[in-house]
């Protein structure tokens, strides 16, 4: 089974992945789920948390990881992605790929014969969001009816948050400047999932105060995302500051609200030092939870 986006998962499957992640967090070592298995880790862009957490996850589950960075592998350059996928499938038991284009993941999954896990692409960041859900749960947040407010650029993280929120019955509010909204495809998918379960809601707004009001979770990410170097920096610095998570915005949320950021953070831009280092910030627990959630994902794909 592949994990390219979250929308192919049922609610029970997401909850089971989170439950298993909790188990792995409490019982970090002594597992052999990946015994005699080799996992390819493909990275087209630099990474700290994703690379460390997946490499450790494979090792701590008893497997072997094979790291390949851009420039060390033919991935659509001098060889088709289809041929690369076919060859890699002869050597490894699964492919974890952090790539620039979602199409690369689709091609790896289509032409390869082993499971493919999306470790991040331009459209989605499913493994990050599973770690976020673990962080919410361990901070006493019930998913059903939870108000999750996202602030900033409508990027891969916001796309995947919408899907996860829809699956679990959350009330998700995405606050972005106009013309920086999340993917229309992901909005459509989220609304379809909400209709399927008959629970939850999705709201898009350009008013951060509406999003923050009585929120249980406040979430932000960098204003210039992967592959967005062509964005107008001057325009961003003009229209994005009102979407910053700061003490004033946080005061509009519930008293026990938590703050999340997938990191790396541009402190002083999308989030202030005061907030990210404050008592309501769970950012570094969230970063650690990448390891535990990704162990659970690896377990899941080899069981299905």
From Swiss-Prot:
SS bond partners: none
Biological process according to GO: arginine biosynthetic process via ornithine; citrulline biosynthetic process; L-arginine biosynthetic process
Localization per record: Cytoplasm
Binding-site residues for carbamoyl phosphate, renumbered to this chain: 47-50, 98, 125-128, 262-263, 290
GO MF: amino acid binding; ornithine carbamoyltransferase activity
Reaction(s) catalysed by this chain's protein: carbamoyl phosphate + L-ornithine = L-citrulline + phosphate + H(+)
The keyword NADP is assigned to this record: no
GO CC terms, sorted: cytoplasm
UniProt entry keywords in alphabetical sequence: Amino-acid biosynthesis, Arginine biosynthesis, Cytoplasm, Transferase
Top EC class, one word: transferase
Binding site for L-ornithine: 156, 221, 225-226
Predominant localisation class: cytoplasm
Database matches in InterPro entries: Asp/Orn_carbamoyltranf_P-bd (IPR006132), Asp/Orn_carbamoylTrfase (IPR006130), Asp/Orn_carbamoylTrfase_sf (IPR036901), Asp_carbamoyltransf_Asp/Orn-bd (IPR006131), Orn/put_carbamltrans (IPR002292), OTCase_ArgI (IPR024904)
Enzyme Commission number: 2.1.3.3
Pathway connected to this protein: Amino-acid biosynthesis; L-arginine biosynthesis; L-arginine from L-ornithine and carbamoyl phosphate: step 1/3
Its biological purpose: Reversibly catalyzes the transfer of the carbamoyl group from carbamoyl phosphate (CP) to the N(epsilon) atom of ornithine (ORN) to produce L-citrulline.
PANTHER family documented for this protein: ORNITHINE CARBAMOYLTRANSFERASE, MITOCHONDRIAL, ORNITHINE TRANSCARBAMYLASE, MITOCHONDRIAL
UniProt similarity note: Belongs to the aspartate/ornithine carbamoyltransferase superfamily. OTCase family.
Protein name, UniProt field: Ornithine carbamoyltransferase
Protein source organism: Methanococcus maripaludis (strain C5 / ATCC BAA-1333)
């Amino acid at each position: 089974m592949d994990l390219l986006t979250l929308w192919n998962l049922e609610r029970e499957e997401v909850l089971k992945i989170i439950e298993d992640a909790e188990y792995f967090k409490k019982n970090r070592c002594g597992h052999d789920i990946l015994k005699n298995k080799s996992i390819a880790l493909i990275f087209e862009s630099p990474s700290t948390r994703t690379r460390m957490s997946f490499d450790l996850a494979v090792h701590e589950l008893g497997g072997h990881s094979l790291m390949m960075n851009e420039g060390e592998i033919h991935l659509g350059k001098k060889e088709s992605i289809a041929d690369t996928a076919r060859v890699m499938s002869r050597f490894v038991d699964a492919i974890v790929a952090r790539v620039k284009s979602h199409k690369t993941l689709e091609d790896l999954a289509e032409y390869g014969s082993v499971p493919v896990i999306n470790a991040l692409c331009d459209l989605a960041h499913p493994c990050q969001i599973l770690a976020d859900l673990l962080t919410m749960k361990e901070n006493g947040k019930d998913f059903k009816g939870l108000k999750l407010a996202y602030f900033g650029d409508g990027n891969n993280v916001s796309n995947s948050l919408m899907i996860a929120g829809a699956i679990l019955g959350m009330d998700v509010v995405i606050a972005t400047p106009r013309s920086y909204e999340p993917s229309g495809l992901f909005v459509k998918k989220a609304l379809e999932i909400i209709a399927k379960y008959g629970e939850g809601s999705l709201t898009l707004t350009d008013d951060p105060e509406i999003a923050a009001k009585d929120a249980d979770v406040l979430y932000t990410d960098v204003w210039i995302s992967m592959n967005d170097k062509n964005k107008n920096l001057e325009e961003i610095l003009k229209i994005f500051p009102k979407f910053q998570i700061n003490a004033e915005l946080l005061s509009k949320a519930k008293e026990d609200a938590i703050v999340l950021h997938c990191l790396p953070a541009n402190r002083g831009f999308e989030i202030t030092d005061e907030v990210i280092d404050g008592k309501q910030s769970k950012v570094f627990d969230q970063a650690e939870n990448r390891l535990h959630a990704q162990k659970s994902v690896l377990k899941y794909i080899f069981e299905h």
